[in-house]
A protein has these predicted regions:
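A short helix-to-beta-strand connector/capping loop
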Residues: 51-60, 127-129, 171-173, 298
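NAD(P)-dependent Rossmann-like dehydrogenase/reductase catalytic/cofactor-binding core
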Residues: 198-202, 227-237, 243-342
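Internal alpha-helical scaffold of NAD(P)-dependent oxidoreductase catalytic cores
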Residues: 83, 94, 119, 123-126, ...
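NAD(P)+-binding Rossmann beta1-loop-alpha1 motif at the extreme N-terminus of oxidoreductases
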Residues: 1-53, 60-63, 90
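Conserved active-site and cofactor/substrate-binding residues in soluble primary-metabolism enzymes
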Residues: 15, 35, 63, 79-82, ...
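Rossmann-like NAD(P)(H) cofactor-binding subdomain of soluble oxidoreductases
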Residues: 55, 61-70, 74-148, 164
Length: 342
């Protein structure tokens, strides 16, 4: 069977390890430190990031990157987005064009404004067609416990997407394929910004109407910037767009929503990040998306106000008023783009 290396032992990396190992694949889980390795081995689970989900005994855990990648035919990258470049740079000597690489990290690199597959490509010393992205409405807490969900594998080559679909598909984890790598990545990254917004609405004690409006107009923003960058508009109506947006904006599993709640209650960004103990991807992604909007001349008013709350300490109440009092406009807009297909 395909030998798999999972790089990153956060909640999502742990959940994917459980999923793939339970299916019978030999999986090596790479962790950053010996202390993390010892803690997981002692407890039989990742108590810090995914408590209550036992790792199958067959999983091999290592803090040695060369050992993790030795013999691997599929490499799953599941580190926080700001750490992807560093880990690929370190892993590059042990990678080759025959290995499949799947990015399961959701975010945009702030300095370069690159998507995760672009970052990976930039650090590989070779060209590869065996690169894909996995994204969808997939909270680790539920996937690790075998609760039914669906996801998307996007790749530039249909054969690559089909092969990976077969590997990841289980009776509780249904995988769809998509040729739109840009759209799938952008949907997975940008929904975290809108989840911060719905959390802020909760923290301000607003109602369901407010959150529905934020999600709907947030999806319009995501679609607007995504299509300018080459994505297919319909992708954002699918699992990696609307599906991921809904679950991230409504679930208390969502770190971004929980962080938004604290912001709405008056805490500053530094207080929120210090108190989570986990990475809140939406905070960095807001900064990147704000820069992308300016770069491409795309209107993203929700993103702009969340940026000002995070980085300029704007009062959330004032931000909401400014959103509501914007100039009048039409709801729908024409989006012209090429059709993405294999």
């Amino acid at each position: 069977m395909t030998q798999i290396a999972v790089l990153g032992a956060g909640s999502w990396g742990t959940a994917l390890t459980v999923l793939l190992s339970t299916k019978g694949y030999p999986v090596k889980l790479w962790v950053r430190s010996q202390a993390t390795l010892d803690a997981i081995q002692a407890a039989g689970q990742n108590e810090r990031y995914l408590p209550g989900v036992m790792l199958p005994p067959a999983v091999k855990i290592t803090s040695n990157l060369e050992e993790a990648l030795s013999g691997a035919e599929l490499v799953v990258v599941v580190t926080p987005s700001h750490g992807v470049r560093e880990i690929i740079k370190r892993a590059a000597p042990y990678l080759d064009e025959d290995k499949y690489i799947v990015s399961a990290s959701k975010g945009i690199e702030v300095d370069s404004l690159l998507r995760m597959t672009e970052v990976i490509t930039a650090e590989l010393p070779f060209q590869t067609e065996r690169l894909a992205v996995l994204s969808g409405p997939n909270h680790a807490e539920e996937v690790g416990r075998g609760m039914p969900t669906t996801t998307v594998i996007a790749a530039g080559k249909k054969a690559v997407a089909d092969h990976l679909q077969d590997i990841f598909m289980t009776p509780t984890f249904r995988v769809y394929t998509n040729p739109d790598v840009v759209g799938v990545e952008m949907g997975g990254a940008l929904k975290n910004i809108i989840a911060l917004g719905t959390g802020i609405a909760d923290g301000l004690n607003f109602g369901d109407n407010s959150k529905a409006a934020l999600m709907t107009r947030g999806l319009a923003e995501i679609t607007r910037i995504g299509t300018v960058m080459g994505a297919r508009p319909l992708t954002f109506a699918g699992l990696s767009g609307l599906g991921d947006l809904v679950v991230t904006c409504t679930s208390m599993h969502s770190r971004n929503r929980r962080a938004g709640i604290e912001l709405g209650r008056g805490k500053k960004m530094a207080e929120v990040t210090a108190g989570t103990g986990m990475v809140v991807e939406g905070i960095r992604t807001t900064r990147a998306a704000y820069a992308l909007a300016r770069k491409y001349g795309v209107e993203m008013p929700i993103t702009e106000q969340i940026y000002k709350i995070l980085y300029e300490e704007k009062n959330p109440h004032v931000a909401v008023v400014d959103l509501m009092l914007r100039g009048k406009t039409h709801e729908t807009e024409e989006i012209v783009t090429g059709f993405v297909d294999w």
